[in-house]
Amino acid sequence: MTQAQGSFTVQAWDESTYEDLAGEAKLTRAHVTFGYAGDLQGQGISDSLMCYRDNGTAVYTGLERITGQLAGRSGSFVLLSTGAYADGEAKTSWQVVEGSGTGDLAGLRGQGSSVAASGPGGTFTFEYDLC
């Protein structure tokens, strides 16, 4: 597998509560736009479901379509992600949805992770194969 690394920034974040739970806990939906730089360059559009807990932590899952270039190859692909927020840091794991690659990225397979401290972005690592 080939490894890619880089950074991402949050370009837009639209989040709304759809269910209030006991105390400060709640369920929300977020529509987020990301910008990517490094071995992966482009833009991602994500929709996620989140569960915030009373203790200030959260868990989330979502889908993100990324359009851009990976190692100089152009196209798009979809990621399925899960993650958790605790101690001021969001840690996310994701995998490429099989069959979602387009253009030069058709046949893309792989998985990765990202870390973001409270702020506008973070870093990612991505291990992939192009079949």
Task: Locate predicted features.
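Targeting-peptide/extracellular-domain and disordered-appendage signature
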Residues: 1-131
